[in-house]
């Protein structure tokens, strides 16, 4: 009987556990597909909503900094609480999206790529090459601020420079209640996103396309 030596790891894997069924599935994956073949070295972080609440979300930041250190991580799906979840889990506050927190720290790019292997047929049978979707992972809606507008009034966008320069634009004149959302991004992160996309396209030999709504959003997009 031949017993295969387990694959040795030199760099620890940052292991981010999640919520609900993902906890069960991740444990099953480790038991059935990883432990028998790999001498797993990992740094474990419990990103389940209960533990995030117990640590005042510090565990999310710790897991992101560990990922910065080691350069590799696996994250399970997590709950981003809404008002109903705050009540259900008796949370201290409505904690922010763990994905948003981690992406902001890593200044990363999200690449969503299909699994292309024999035995898994695509819906379009003659579709042989993958399509990968890249998304800028910093800022935008994940770092947005929101206001419930109570009644009539004027909403303004104001930038005050460190040199005292003030730039002001009127967003909307409300004649009744409404909502406001402010988003931002920074050139450094935008340039990093572009470099990541070009590098990924070159590494995987895929054609790179860029989509934007600059006909409407002439400065932001």
Question: Model-predicted segments: where are they?
Answer:
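General structural feature for long, well-ordered alpha-helical segments within catalytic domains
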Residues: 21, 25, 29, 33, ...
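An acidic- and aromatic-residue-enriched active-site/binding cleft used to recognize and process polar
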Residues: 47, 79, 213
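N-terminal alpha-helical transmembrane segments of multi-pass membrane transport
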Residues: 5-11, 21-26, 30-57, 64-67
């Amino acid at each position: 009987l031949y017993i295969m030596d387990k694959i040795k790891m030199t760099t620890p894997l940052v292991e981010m556990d999640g919520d609900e069924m993902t906890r069960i599935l991740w444990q099953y994956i480790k038991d059935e597909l990883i432990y028998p073949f790999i001498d797993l070295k990992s740094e474990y972080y419990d990103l389940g909503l209960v533990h995030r609440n117990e640590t005042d979300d510090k565990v999310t930041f710790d897991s992101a900094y560990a990922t910065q250190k080691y350069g590799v991580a696996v994250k399970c799906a997590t709950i981003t609480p809404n008002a109903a979840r705050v009540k259900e889990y008796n949370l201290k506050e409505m904690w922010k999206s763990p994905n948003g927190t981690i992406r902001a720290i890593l200044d990363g790019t999200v690449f969503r790529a299909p699994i292309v292997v024999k035995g898994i047929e695509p819906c379009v049978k003659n579709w042989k090459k993958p399509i990968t979707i890249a998304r800028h992972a910093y800022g935008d809606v994940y770092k947005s601020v929101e206001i419930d507008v109570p009644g009539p009034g004027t909403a303004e966008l104001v930038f005050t420079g460190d040199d005292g320069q003030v730039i002001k634009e009127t967003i909307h004149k409300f004649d009744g209640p409404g909502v406001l959302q402010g988003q931002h991004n920074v050139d450094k992160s935008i340039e990093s996103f572009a470099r990541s996309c070009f590098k990924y396209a070159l590494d995987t030999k895929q054609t790179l396309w860029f989509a934007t709504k600059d006909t409407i959003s002439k400065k932001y997009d």
